[in-house]
Amino acid sequence: MTNPVRWLFSTNHKDIGTLYFIFGAIAGVMGTCFSVLIRMELARPGDQILGGNHQLYNVLITAHAFFMIFFMVMPAMIGGSGNWSVPILIGAPDMAFPRLNNISFWLLPPSLLLLLSSALVEVGSGTGWTVYPPLSGITSHSGGAVDSAISSLHLSGVSSILGSINFLTTISNMRGPGMTMHRSPLFVWSVPVTAFPLLLSLPVLAGAITMLLTDRNFNTTFSDPAGGGDPILYQHLFRFFGHPEVYIPILPGSGIISHIVSTFSGKPVFGYLGMVYAMISIGVLGFLVWAHHMFTVGLDVDTRAYFTAATMIIAVPTGIKIFSWIATMWGGSIQYKTPMLFAVGFIFLFTIGGLTGIVPANSGLDIALHDTYYVVAHFHYVLSMGAVFALFAGFHYWVGKIFGRTYPETLGKIHFWITFFGVNLTLFPMHFLGLSGMPRRIPDYPDAYAGWNALSSFGSYISVVGIRRFFVVVTITSSSGNNITRANIPWAVEQNSTTLEWLVQSPPAFHTFGELPAIKETKSYVK
């Protein structure tokens, strides 16, 4: 365990998954620190801790978004959970391309360092995560900060593309004998449905930010109307990537939630095939709705009508998933252990996030709500309470498999309730701020907004206490939890017979399967 060479050159999927988790935890703590600094600045009207440095405020906003999306949620959800679980769940000895797996991870730390360094160059990169021109152009952001951030995005994108190729190949070609796709758990389905959109959308982002790079450094005018360019072109290219990107962390999360709800309800997932097709539909529809982020840029009325309708259609497969989870729990013998609490919390909060998303999907209403705190509240309910709660649920569910020890149940539940209360107190008041017209990315505001902002900032401090409790749980589990034996499987219910991970020892051997398991049982999800 302590040999650095083993970790640096490892081609073992479990080692690399662990590295992804550690990296995601570090980036998550840093991103949380940025968000708390933002909330401290917004706790009261007027200039607070940043002393009137509004560029620094925008640098914090940008860093918070990049850290949380590209360096926390995606590495932990796809790299961590995917690497650890997918080969075991499909009965594969390892990933298809182990050395590619290694470089996929090791591209991320330099990418993170590039992003950090961008904040230290001149005035930093204060563009927001969208990096829209002309704000990101050479006249508004001279110096190397934005170039450094763009290079960071390129590295992160290459990492994701290589990882996606690896997962698609592994799941296509390396399933154990008898493990058909229709026998695979929903988490296994969610990974290729996530990898395809990544593979298709990341090159578009790469093209967009490369155009931006040449505009800044080589005097091209892709985004400058003076030379025949158009800043709206960049918005279309970025959002073509950016919208699938926000579904990408949610899909593996929904696979994890399906796994957990099924186990703790003691029943197979309700409507397995419907769940699969719903995931595929979300993956496809995610590419057809990007301009709903652009209702205010002057699109013609027919275009806005189409994107309004297409955005609302995404609610259908999402609703199928939510009702299937509820139907799975209906009449089940439910055990409210920590993973199940996070799963139920996910379903409740993800539903709220989905409902609040239907409102700005209307292009007419979005004229009023665009770039207000209503939008911030909506996507944080989906991401901060969707993806992150799914990660916490999956961690508590599989931590016994990873460490070979049980986590402290009471501390896990305390972690859930503090976090649940904190994030709701932080984000729910933002709906009211947005409906009142408070714009995003602004470090100061009129006194009328002071009450809800104070409440929101207080909630963010509570969330930090909850996250600290999470690291206490991790420390106790890794150092002094009870050992798990074959006879002491933490979730010993009949439903586990449909997945392979509890049939191997905890923690699994360095090479999980001495010989490939033959899947012979007839209780496949689809007859």
UniProtKB/Swiss-Prot annotation:
Keyword set, alphabetical order: Calcium, Copper, Electron transport, Heme, Iron, Magnesium, Membrane, Metal-binding, Mitochondrion, Mitochondrion inner membrane, Respiratory chain, Translocase, Transmembrane, Transmembrane helix, Transport
Membrane topology: Multi-pass membrane protein
Major localization listed first in the record, in broad terms: mitochondrion
Binding-site list for Ca(2+): E41, G46, P443
Record InterPro entries: Cyt_c_oxase-like_su1_dom (IPR023616), Cyt_c_oxase-like_su1_sf (IPR036927), Cyt_C_Oxase_1 (IPR000883), Cyt_c_oxase_su1_dom (IPR033944)
Enzyme nomenclature, EC number: 7.1.1.9
Residues that, per the record, bind O2: Y247
Catalysis: reaction(s): 4 Fe(II)-[cytochrome c] + O2 + 8 H(+)(in) = 4 Fe(III)-[cytochrome c] + 2 H2O + 4 H(+)(out)
Cofactor: heme; Cu cation
Pathway terms, separated by semicolons: Energy metabolism; oxidative phosphorylation
Binding sites annotated in the UniProt record for Cu cation: H243, H292, H293
An example Gene Ontology molecular-function term: metal ion binding
Binding site for Mg(2+): H370, D371
Subcellular localization: Mitochondrion inner membrane
Protein residues bound to heme a3: H378
GO term, biological process aspect, one: mitochondrial electron transport, cytochrome c to oxygen
Record function comment: Component of the cytochrome c oxidase, the last enzyme in the mitochondrial electron transport chain which drives oxidative phosphorylation. The respiratory chain contains 3 multisubunit complexes succinate dehydrogenase (complex II, CII), ubiquinol-cytochrome c oxidoreductase (cytochrome b-c1 complex, complex III, CIII) and cytochrome c oxidase (complex IV, CIV), that cooperate to transfer electrons derived from NADH and succinate to molecular oxygen, creating an electrochemical gradient over the inner membrane that drives transmembrane transport and the ATP synthase.
Assembly and binders: Component of the cytochrome c oxidase (complex IV, CIV), a multisubunit enzyme composed of a catalytic core of 3 subunits and several supernumerary subunits. The complex exists as a monomer or a dimer and forms supercomplexes (SCs) in the inner mitochondrial membrane with ubiquinol-cytochrome c oxidoreductase (cytochrome b-c1 complex, complex III, CIII).
Protein's name in the database: Cytochrome c oxidase subunit 1
Organism: Pisum sativum (Garden pea)
